[in-house]
Curated annotation (Swiss-Prot):
Listed GO MF terms: ubiquitin protein ligase activity; zinc ion binding
Chief site of localization: endoplasmic reticulum
Localization per Swiss-Prot or TrEMBL: Endoplasmic reticulum membrane
Lineage of the organism: Eukaryota, Metazoa, Chordata, Craniata, Vertebrata
Protein name: E3 ubiquitin-protein ligase TRIM13
Amino acid sequence: MELLEEDLTCPICCSLFDDPRVLPCSHNFCKKCLEGILEGNVRNSLWRSSPFKCPTCRKETSATGVNSLQVNYSLKGIVEKYNKIKVSPKMPVCKGHLGQPLNIFCLTDMQLICGICATRGEHTKHVFCSIEDAYAQERDAFESLFQSFETWRRGDALSRLDTLETSKRKSLQLLTKDSDKVKEFFEKLQYTLDQKKNEILSDFETMKLAVMQAYDPEINKLNTILQEQRMAFNIAEAFKDVSEPIIFLQQMQEFREKIKVIKETPLPPSNLPSSPLMKNFDTSQWEDIKLVDVDKLSLPQDTGTFISKIPWRLYPLFVVVILLGLLIFFSPTMFLEWSLFDEIATWKDNLSNFSSYLTRSADFVEQSVFYWEQLTDGLFIFSERLKSFTLVVLNNVAEFVCKYKLL
């Protein structure tokens, strides 16, 4: 199109030809352009007229006016068609045949095709029509198709759209609610973990304080002993070169007393017993703890005694339970014990009298009396030991409570 436009352009105004006129030399120009040139020649030649020369080849012509020049109807028609093509939309091309315009309509397949598709392609035996006829036919078909489509299931589609949007909104609300539950669950879980962490770390701080209370006094004792030793060495350094007997003897007496005090001061042990928690602590023991059992996390306890397995915060409750249990268990025992003791003492007197009677009555029961006496003595000793054991247990529990200040 650009090359064609060059051939349809006037050399003077550089625009498409407007009412083109052809000169005897066969060059074409717009009528208005030639009129302008002729008017210029008339103004420049006041005394005599100069011949008209072609603007392209400069060949003179005897034309006296533009109207006398021949109209180039062929060129004028080409320019008019070119303007129509230029204004009209660009014609689509065939995808299967490069550059071929889609200028034929296939009625069989109801689609645009090119000339090659119609003569040598898959549409060779189909029915064709012109673009104008196809346009008129499809325009009528469009009206009926559009009307039927406009009412096709529109209400059903709108109803389903409303249902889907409602379901979507409810689903999102449920998901949001579940999401909030999950968030709340993990917040509680995090709170539980933080609580357990703070609890265990607090136990560690308590143990650190206990360690410092155990070691600091011994360390201070050793520092005091070392300081006394340095003072003794300073005294020795001060008077070892003294030549006055009195002064030397006084200093020697002071030095000997200082050495005596230092030697008599016992050194604290260097290996204090460590806490069982420090020996047995290992976080790998927590690896099997499930999230649902996270509240069961605790520091490892001493496995040597039952008391050490009880968490420190439960000691008061444990002691109360022990005291109540002992009181409930041993109250009837103690009651029976003292009443049994009185009965046994009575039985012993009666058996002694009875054995004396049997001894006087017959000698063959002498051995039986001996065994009865042994039995009564054994029961008496058992009751005494049971009473002593009960008192020892109660005293130990009371001392334990007072010592650790659990109540």
